[in-house]
């Protein structure tokens, strides 16, 4: 629990794990005095709002059907749609290091377009120009100290974007966040990450109760307590634990549920066992965190594992593709030692969509020639020449160009690709690699120009315009991932008529069909310490196969097949809706079919 300040009024609610017999008297009461209207119709919550929330909850519960033992079934008729709160460490375009930021940039607007009320809660890593101070403050116990956090807010594409403001987030990052959300550089974590994300989880539980958001013409007032929280990856795995220990034990959020989404099982939040005391959770949760592995990082021996706790304490576990869901329970190799834990709870796989407004060849501002499925064959050669010129390769529209865009780390297989280039670079082909990540991998791709001056280029920079140029101008997109929960690069590529050449893992299996929309290389060895020569050969062999098809009738049909697909969030959002409705949260109903409430707006991401 937390202390809540709205305008200049503070009322205290004591945190802790034990329940109180007079819970109602401990609820935060925020009065009418000095109430401020701040921006976009947002104002501080007041006593009238609190009473209205309680009355609505009572009226709703009176309509709930009872089971034989008198407990509520959970479905109440009190409006349309669900109250959804996505909690996450990053959200595009404000903060993004990879697919997680893209997903929560695109899925929430799609859910809003389906008639649901949607909020996202993430850290405020920078002074975002389009997010404004709500003047709502809460005090949260983090470790041994009481920390004060503020909420910033903006309303975009039908979604309440809420940002948790605290120096623990701001002091880590300057300018665009790049890869410094989780650590000072790739592969290194901040030492206080357990405190940073503990604060995020607790603040996220307060946001639906204390923020009186009225920006939408469809919904107004606080979200209240009948909500579905969607926690994402290990950074938010404490949320179901705090929900139970700090709220439900005191009679609050009784009908709320938590869906826990695994975007990447490789990152689990493993800390030393002694760090459990920093989380301010009762001992009854220790078993959910308890974990033992054979590694010496961060400490040798027994540890706590945040993701394990998130899986066990949530009401539903979901991941980002059906095939990845099967891989996670297939054994310790793909499940990264949590396969047995996931098997106990079951898991649902829902393939990701993509942002078809940002990634649209017909309107893309980063390419010189816009096109659609009817003009792609005319536009591609022109865009290829522009791409070749931009990176300094010989300009020739007849040479097949292969692209790679991604993080330079073991998961994405950039080291396997670099090792394979020598095996096919003698063919009539050029290759362009764009990415940032581990320094040794950045150095590898930067050396390509020296090794193959007329054949290859490596750009170790964060370069959005070039990413769009490669996606549009390349003929093939290589995705050599050792494992890939879902993947967005192959979706972007197909949207632009660029044929994927991909490993057969995770969401790549679900989204790319061999011989119809792409070429599969087979599954790779997930051992990251070395490059498996067999995987190098798989890349070389499949590239040769793709180059042999280049320019053929079958190749042109594959381009058409790629571009004819609906890769938007519309279908995945409906699958998410079905899954979340099955949790039976009070007030939940199917949303009203429609489109996104607002078109893509120009986002002012960060101050210069």
Curated annotation (Swiss-Prot):
GO BP, one annotated term: starch biosynthetic process
Cellular location(s): Plastid, Chloroplast; Plastid, Amyloplast
Polar residues bias spans: 1-10
HAMAP family in alphabetical order: Glycogen_synth
Reactions accelerated catalytically: [(1->4)-alpha-D-glucosyl](n) + ADP-alpha-D-glucose = [(1->4)-alpha-D-glucosyl](n+1) + ADP + H(+)
SUPFAM superfamilies named among the record's database cross-references: UDP-Glycosyltransferase/glycogen phosphorylase
Gene symbol of the encoding locus: WAXY
Induction remarks: Expressed with a circadian rhythm with peak expression at the end of the day.
Pfam family, one: Glycos_transf_1
Positions of region (Disordered): 1-24, 588-608
The keyword Transit peptide is annotated on this UniProt entry: yes
GO cellular component, one term: amyloplast
Enzyme class, first EC level, given as a word: transferase
InterPro entries: Glyco_trans_1, GS/SS, Starch_synth_cat_dom
Record's protein name: Granule-bound starch synthase 1, chloroplastic/amyloplastic
Binding site for ADP-alpha-D-glucose: 96
Organism: Antirrhinum majus
Transit peptide per record: 1-78
Gene3D superfamilies: Glycogen Phosphorylase B (3.40.50.2000)
GO MF annotation terms: alpha-1,4-glucan glucosyltransferase (ADP-glucose donor) activity; alpha-1,4-glucan glucosyltransferase (UDP-glucose donor) activity
Record keywords: Amyloplast, Chloroplast, Glycosyltransferase, Plastid, Starch biosynthesis, Transferase, Transit peptide
EC number(s) per entry: 2.4.1.21
PANTHER family: GRANULE-BOUND STARCH SYNTHASE 1, CHLOROPLASTIC/AMYLOPLASTIC (PTHR45825), GRANULE-BOUND STARCH SYNTHASE 1, CHLOROPLASTIC_AMYLOPLASTIC (PTHR45825:SF3)
Annotated family: Belongs to the glycosyltransferase 1 family. Bacterial/plant glycogen synthase subfamily.
Pathway: Glycan biosynthesis; starch biosynthesis
Disulfide cross-links: none
Tissues with expression: In leaves, flowers and fruits. Observed in all floral whorls at early developmental stages, but restricted to carpel before anthesis.
């Amino acid at each position: 629990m937390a202390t809540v300040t709205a305008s200049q009024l503070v009322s205290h609610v004591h945190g802790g794990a034990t329940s109180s017999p007079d819970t109602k008297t401990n609820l935060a009461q925020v009065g009418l005095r000095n109430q401020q209207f701040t921006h976009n119709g947002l104002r501080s919550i007041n006593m009238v709002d609190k009473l209205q929330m309680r009355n609505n909850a009572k009226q709703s519960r009176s309509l709930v059907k009872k089971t034989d033992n008198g407990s509520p079934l959970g479905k109440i008729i009190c409006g349309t749609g669900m109250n959804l709160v996505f909690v996450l460490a990053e959200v595009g375009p404000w903060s993004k290091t990879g697919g997680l930021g893209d997903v929560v940039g695109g899925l929430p607007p799609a859910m809003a377009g389906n008639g649901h009320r949607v909020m996202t809660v993430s850290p405020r890593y920078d002074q975002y120009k389009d997010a404004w101070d709500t003047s709502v403050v809460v005090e949260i116990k983090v470790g041994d100290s009481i920390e004060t956090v503020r909420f910033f807010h903006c309303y975009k594409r039908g979604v309440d974007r809420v940002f948790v403001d605290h120096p623990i987030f701001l002091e880590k990052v300057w300018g665009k966040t790049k890869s410094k959300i989780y650590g000072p550089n790739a592969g290194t974590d901040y030492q206080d990450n357990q405190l940073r994300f503990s604060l995020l989880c607790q603040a996220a539980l307060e946001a639906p109760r204390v923020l009186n958001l009225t920006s939408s013409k469809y919904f107004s007032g606080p979200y209240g307590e009948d909500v579905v929280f969607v926690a994402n990856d290990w950074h938010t795995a404490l949320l179901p634990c705090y929900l139970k220990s700090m709220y439900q034990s005191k009679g609050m959020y009784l009908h709320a549920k938590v869906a826990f989404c695994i975007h990447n099982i490789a990152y689990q939040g493993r800390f030393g066992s002694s760090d459990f005391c920093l989380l301010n959770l009762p001992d009854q949760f220790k078993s959910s965190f308890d974990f033992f592995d054979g590694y010496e990082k961060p400490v040798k021996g027994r540890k706590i594992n945040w993701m394990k706790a998130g899986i066990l304490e949530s009401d539903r576990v979901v991941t980002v593709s059906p095939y990845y869901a099967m891989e996670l329970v297939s054994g310790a190799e793909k499940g990264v030692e949590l396969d047995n834990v996931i098997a106990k709870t079951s898991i649902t796989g829902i393939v990701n969509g993509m942002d078809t407004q940002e990634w649209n060849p017909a309107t893309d501002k980063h390419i010189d020639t816009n096109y659609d499925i009817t003009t792609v064959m005319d536009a591609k050669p022109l865009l290829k020449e522009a791409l070749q010129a931009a990176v300094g390769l010989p300009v020739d529209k007849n040479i097949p160009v292969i692209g790679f865009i991604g993080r330079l780390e073991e998961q994405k297989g950039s080291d396997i690709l670099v090792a394979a280039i020598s095996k096919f670079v003698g063919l009539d082909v050029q290759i362009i690699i764009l990415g940032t990540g581990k320094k040794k991998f950045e150095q590898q791709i930067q050396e390509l120009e020296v090794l193959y001056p007329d054949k290859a280029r490596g750009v170790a920079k964060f370069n959005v315009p070039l990413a769009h140029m490669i996606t549009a101008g390349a003929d093939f997109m290589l995705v050599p991932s050792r494992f890939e929960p879902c993947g967005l690069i192959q979706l972007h590529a197909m949207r632009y008529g660029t044929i994927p050449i991909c490993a057969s893992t995770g969401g790549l299996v679900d989204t790319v069909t061999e011989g119809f929309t792409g070429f599969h290389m087979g599954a790779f060895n997930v051992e990251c310490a070395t490059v498996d020569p067999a995987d190098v050969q798989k890349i070389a062999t499949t590239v040769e196969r793709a180059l042999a098809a280049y320019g053929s009738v079958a190749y042109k049909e594959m381009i058409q097949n790629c571009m004819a697909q609906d890769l938007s969030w519309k279908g995945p959002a409906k699958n998410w809706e079905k899954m979340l409705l099955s949790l039976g949260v009070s007030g939940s109903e199917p949303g009203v079919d429609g489109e996104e409430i607002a078109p893509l707006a120009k986002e002012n991401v960060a101050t210069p």
